[in-house]
Amino acid sequence: MTGTFTRRGFIGLSAAAVAAGLAACTGGGTAPAPAGQGGTSAPASNDLRWFDYESAQSLELLKEQIAKFDAQAGTTTTVDSLPGSGAAVYPDKLRTELLGGKGPDVWRIWGGQIGAPFVTAKQAMDLAPYYQKFGWDSRINTVAIEGMTFEGVKAGVPFTARAMGAWYNKSLFEKAGITNDPASYAELEEANDKLLSAGITPCATGGKYGWHIMRLYEYLLETSAGPELHDKLLKGEESWDRPEVVTAFTNFKKWQDQKWIPDGALGLDPSDIEPSYVQGKTAYTITGQWAEAEHIQAAKKDPADFGVFQLPTGHTPQRHSGFVEGYMINARSGNPDKSAELIDFILQPETQKALKIGSSTVAGAEPDPQSSPLSYQWSQGPGKQPFYTIQDQAFPKKVADQYFAIQSDLLQGKITPEEAAKQMQDAVSAWAKN
C-alpha cells in the first residue's frame, strides 16, 4: 500500500492488514482548525445537513447520536437518508444536489470508484488538516484510510471496513437436515437443494438497483476464476471474454433457474428481501456485520438462533467480498469546522458502539462478544482472511451500471452467458483504456 488510491488500487485487500492497521492506532493530536477549501463556500452557519443511506432501524440510532452532538456543539443538524438504493442511485442523487449548490455538509460514501469522482470534481474537501487536528491517523485503521485516500488526497474518513458472508437461520438449516456449514461450492449447491426440498427458498437476494444480486455473481466469479484472475479482471488487466467468466454467468443463471433465489428476484428491493432470513421466509442472505444489529437485534431475535459463515470458494487464500465506507465534507460547506467536529464525534469509540457498527475502523470500537456475538465471531475467523473489493466499488459508476444491466439481461434470458462475458469485456476494456 502506498497511501494513494487509484482505480487499480485497493483490490484484494487483506482483512488481516486492516486488523494490523487498527492495532497500530495509539493516540491523538492537535493542530489549528482549517478553513474550507475547494471553491466558494456557503455563508457560515450552525445549521448542518448530513446525507446518508442508513436503513430505518440504523437511522434512528444515528439521529440519536447526532442530536447529542447538536446539544453539545450548539448546532442544528438535519439528517436525510436514501436507504436501500445502494450505489445505483445514491451517488447520482448526491451529485445532483452538489451540482445544484444545495448539497449536504457531510455525506456518507463508499471508497473506491464510487467516492473518487467527488474528489476529482473538487466537491469533497481535502481533510488532511482535520486528520492532523483530531489525530485520525492514529485513531483510525491506517489501511482503511488508504481506501478513502484518492491520488494522495485524504478526502474521506473511513468508519467501517465491511465484509460479506452468508448470514443464516439455524432452525431452517436444521429443518433441511444441514448440520455443518458448507465447506465447498458443491456443498453449498447441495445445501440449496436440501433447503428447496424442505420448502424453503435458500438465498434472499433482490435485483432492484443491481448491487445486491451482484454479491452472488461476484462470489461465483471468485469461485470459478480464483483470486489472481479475479483481481486482474477487476482491474481490466485480463479479458472477461473467457471460460471462467462464462462459467460464473452460467452458474448465476442456474441459481435463478433452480429457484435457489426468490421468484422474481430481479424486481425485489434489497431492503425488503434481505431480512427475510430472520423472518423465516428464506434460509440465508449474503450481507455484512451490520446484519446483526439491523436484522436480528432490531427484530428482537436471539443471535444464538442465527449463524454466519464464509462462502466457500475452493481457493487459497479463501476470500470474501469487502469494502470501505466513510464520510466526506462538502468543499462549499458553510461550516466545515463544525462538520469535522461532528464526524469526530461519530468516530468516538463510545459513539461507534452506540451505533452498533460491527466492523468499525476506530480503535477501541471492536465488536463486543457479549452484545454482538456473531460480528465478533466473524472478526475472529473469516474477518482475518483477505477480501477482494466489492465489484460496484471496484468499477466506476458507468461500468457498474452496464454490469448491472448485463446481469439483468442474462437472468431475463435476453442474452447467453457467452454474450454476457463478451459484453462485460466491452464495458471494462473501454474503461481500462482510459
Residue spans for each PLM region:
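Conserved N-terminal structural module of periplasmic/extracytoplasmic solute-binding proteins
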Residues: 2-116, 136, 180, 300, ...
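Extracytoplasmic/periplasmic substrate-binding proteins
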Residues: 53, 64-65, 250-335
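Short, solvent-exposed loop/beta-turn-alpha elements that line the ligand-binding surface or hinge
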Residues: 128-140, 203, 207, 224-247, ...
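Extracytoplasmic/periplasmic solute-binding protein
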Residues: 150-159, 164, 189-238, 282
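Hinge/lid segment of periplasmic solute-binding proteins
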Residues: 110-163, 216-218, 244, 303-308
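C-terminal lobe and pocket-closing loops
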Residues: 116-117, 121, 288-303, 314-405, ...
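Glycine-centered hinge/linker elements that transmit conformational signals in sensory
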Residues: 192-194, 234-265
